[in-house]
Amino acid sequence: MIKQALISVSDKTGIVDFAKSLSDLGVKLLSTGGTAKLLADAGLPVTEVADYTGFPEMLDGRVKTLHPKVHGGILARRDLPEHMQALEQHDIPTIDLLVVNLYPFVATIAKDDCTLADAIENIDIGGPTMLRSAAKNHRDVTVVVDPADYAVVLDEMKANGNAIGYATNFRLATKVFAHTAQYDGAITNYLTSLTDELQHASRSAYPATLNMAFDKVQDLRYGENPHQSAAFYRDLAAPAGALANYRQLQGKELSYNNIADSDAAWECVKTFDVPACVIIKHANPCGVAVGNDSADAYAKAFQTDPTSAFGGIIAFNREVDEAAAQAVAKQFVEVLIAPSFSDAAKQVFAAKQNVRLLEIALGDGHNAFDLKRVGGGLLVQSLDSKNVQPSELRVVTKRQPSAKEMDDLLFAWRVAKYVKSNAIVFCGNGMTLGVGAGQMSRVDSARIASIKAQNAGLTLAGSAVASDAFFPFRDGLDVVVAAGATCVIQPGGSMRDDEVIAAADEHGIAMILTGVRHFRH
């Protein structure tokens, strides 16, 4: 039974109402510093920890709760007579409920004007110590680190005469250890990122020790293949607009491959400023287009490769309305992603309950790192978020691209970044015409992209081509020109750039170098 609670929080969301409810249930309240003042100002009967222990706060508040009368009351096992006798001998009442959250270290170091001294002062000592003590003794003590659990605790107390069951205490204790691990991980990441100057402004992007925290969203039926087990975890620092923030409106459970392909589709489509549609199959775009609205963009994207689009993942960067929904509903689709779906669109898919509809708010946030596991290690790099500015583009051929060709080239370049290397992408009039992906030689990707367009009945005459990396020889260029391309955009940087540029001039096409490579593996 909970008779006494100690409350000390930095995040004061809902704390006054929670404390009032505890007081109404007859629970004695202990508190510290600003939290105690807040509760007292709200008219609640609260005892300062300094008065409770008989020892004042000291060292600018660094020492407040590090006292036997606090930790003895938390750590004592109620089932051990010798523990209870020790409490009685030293006049230490039990503390049955601990409500603590920590100094805002992560928020502090995120500030541009943060100094190392600011960071150090926001490393909580007493809070984690109390939390770990209470979590260790969760058999007898309820510990709350998340304001979202206030209502859960109150409901159970009211239903059980101020008592909390073991299952709830255990769950809350595991949240504490996850929270303190994340907190210590953030401190370690920060301190080990400091360079020799030991200044906040001179931090390295890659700390000497890397700690990351993820919460499990769900177990998955299986992994990439049926014999593999899998689960999906959400980054606790997931940025705005990230796939992990999806809301599923209908459909079967997402699979491992659904999630991976959905991420590829969403990351690509949200880079466009105008209505766009991206169709993904096996992590590669098989159709990308912009249009007047979602329905128009989908119709164009689907034309690129109707065969591969079967059972694909489709993403939009605008609301899916009834017209777009009716067009998509004619095909077999695994997942449909958009910032929103109109009520009429939802009605269209109500009859297709296996189709997974995901809503994700548009946002331009990116993961802090791109990660790739290797045997016994982890490759960590910054995101490939480089957008080439017009001033960085170099026309290296005698012929300049026309305004239309320039638009087509920039569209193709945007798409090529999301195609597995080696990537060749034919585009025209705001849509992909042929995509060659994942080949060991660039010339084979060029041939495949050309064949794909041919199979779809699309003409490549006057098309624009993007290559994610340089042409090592002129053969790839010869293939795309023979297919009908009149302009090419590529990074450049080959030992044979001069030979490739000369070939472009020989063919009378325009070529632009970006100076940026977009390998994707």
Swiss-Prot record:
Keyword terms, alphabetized: Hydrolase, Multifunctional enzyme, Purine biosynthesis, Transferase
GO CC term (a single one): cytosol
Pfam families, per database record: AICARFT_IMPCHas, MGS
Gene Ontology process terms (BP): 'de novo' IMP biosynthetic process
Pathway(s) per entry: Purine metabolism; IMP biosynthesis via de novo pathway; 5-formamido-1-(5-phospho-D-ribosyl)imidazole-4-carboxamide from 5-amino-1-(5-phospho-D-ribosyl)imidazole-4-carboxamide (10-formyl THF route): step 1/1; Purine metabolism; IMP biosynthesis via de novo pathway; IMP from 5-formamido-1-(5-phospho-D-ribosyl)imidazole-4-carboxamide: step 1/1
Signal peptide: none
Catalytic activity of the protein: (6R)-10-formyltetrahydrofolate + 5-amino-1-(5-phospho-beta-D-ribosyl)imidazole-4-carboxamide = 5-formamido-1-(5-phospho-D-ribosyl)imidazole-4-carboxamide + (6S)-5,6,7,8-tetrahydrofolate; IMP + H2O = 5-formamido-1-(5-phospho-D-ribosyl)imidazole-4-carboxamide
Enzyme Commission code: 2.1.2.3, 3.5.4.10
The keyword Hydrolase appears for this protein: yes
Similarity comment text for this entry: Belongs to the PurH family.
The protein's name: Bifunctional purine biosynthesis protein PurH
